[in-house]
Amino acid sequence: MDLDRDANLAVQGSVAAGSMDRGDGTAPRFSSAERGLSVLLDILDELGMRGTFFIEGRTAETIDCSCLQGHCIGLHGYDHEDLTGESTGIPMGPSAVSEALSKGFDAVSDAVSRPVCFRAPYMACDDAVLGAVSDLGIRHDSSFYSDGPMEPYETTHGITEHPVPKGKDAAGKTIAAYLWPMHEGRRPPADYIRFADTAEGDFILADHTWHMVEARGGILDAGAASENAAKTADVLRGILDLGFEPAVLLRFGGRSGRRPRPARR
């Protein structure tokens, strides 16, 4: 799960991200991230699951993250930086990347605990970013998509990659294991359950906490937010019913334990 600023928005000419304008400009907001975190944690508690939370440094400094004790803590940059320059058009050099990640690492460490894994903002990652991540002592990453087997694999700098699944649905349309389209009303929960049923190996399901209570079109009212939470719970229950066992990132593969292959139906 990505715990970052509300409805993050790449701002042209700025390395740091903003939030979608709700009438007061694009300055970062964090209230939906905090409210959505509470909703998501309630769902996980109800299902007896722990989550992996990739936390942005500034978010960790702004909201109360103490509720995340006991969950797996990862790093998501400091200011939701576009570390490769793909979205903002501003390439960050190696020293700037290292500085941003180090600042985020310290902020998350102070607010919750030392991050043990990493996901790049915008899923924009390259070898230079992995090098900076490795310098922080982090050895697990989840910044890449894969349309093949979902086994963790070794990358450069001694880092193990845990890819996010991506493939085709029954209609031949691209689908990824990010719940973003569901929250925006473009996919039903059943699409993700069917996608998981085709997976070989681990199935990493990704989401944003702010998306529990806000969509790109605006803040959700109480009824819409409740329906949104119910859909999220339906996805998780449906995947568990396939035979998957819940696990945080560092329990996927390797010496830290393996989730058994789900029973096929």
Task: Map each language-model feature to its residues.
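Short, solvent-exposed loop/turn segments at secondary-structure junctions
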Residues: 2-6, 58-60, 79-81, 122-125, ...
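Active-site beta->alpha N-cap acidic-glycine motif
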Residues: 1-70
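Metal-dependent polysaccharide deacetylase catalytic core of the NodB/CE4 family, i.e.
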Residues: 47-126, 204-212
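Active-site-adjacent pocket scaffolds in enzyme catalytic domains
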Residues: 117-201, 207
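Histidine/acidic-residue-rich catalytic or RNA/ligand-binding cores of hydrolases
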Residues: 84-85, 130, 153-154, 214-221
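The substrate-binding groove and active-site-proximal loops of carbohydrate-active enzymes
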Residues: 21-31, 50-56, 84-97, 116, ...
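Generic structural signal for well-ordered alpha-helices
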Residues: 37-41, 64-65, 98-106, 130, ...
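C-terminal domain-boundary segment and adjacent tail
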Residues: 45, 194-265
